[in-house]
Amino acid sequence: MNRWGMVVFGQIDGFSRLISQLHLSTDNKASSALFTFITSIREYSVPSRIRLDNGSEFNHVEHLMNVLNGENRGSVIRGPSVHNQRIERLWRDVFSKVLSKYYNIFNHMEKCNVLDILNPIHMFSLQYVFVPRIQNALKQWTQAHNSHPVRTEKKQTPNQLWFAGSMESRGENSTAMNNLFRRNISETNIEIDEILAEYQLEEPNNIKVVLPRYEAPLTPQQLNELYLTINPMENSVSEAIDIFGRVVQYIGVCRRL
């Protein structure tokens, strides 16, 4: 989805197959990856160890893991994602079950000259309309995935496996169990801006593919009017292409004023 300025960040538990977070972002900054990770640990606590891709966009996540769990204990394993079968399977499923629909819609819009990816107004409008729709689809699919029976685990769901595994191990003096059951939740109720400022974390300058950020070509008042006028989640008879057209038209009218 990079072509249209979108990227999905996500995490999956290797034992239970529970997806703790899938988040659609309009950039691939390290701060965006960190935001997704913080959202995950607020709900499921800080894991003992995680696997991360070699990409620089995950540097802030590695830093936070070392802050929360301590340095030099192997809290983060870095390497190519192809060595992580769980996450590779997850990305295949996410594309086939959720993203492929929008991939085809966007390609169709380009072929019909409805969408010009070199036009900032078109790109902002595309993201305005489709980011919340895709995020909602990801949320629904995540809930379905976490509630589906796993054939090789006696028909238990990822939710059940995660809960049962946590209860079975709750008495262990391990980092994961201490984080889950005995750590003050306020320690993980952290804000991304505070972390970036406290540890002086800056965006890496060696991210291989940098997604451009499309700012609203509107005044604050016009943008607020857009939010009040056009709901990106409203019903559509054309897979939201009609809503996209209305947003483009609205911006065009505003810019002529």
Region spans (language model):
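Short clusters of hydrophobic/aromatic residues that line enzyme substrate/ligand-binding pockets
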Residues: L161
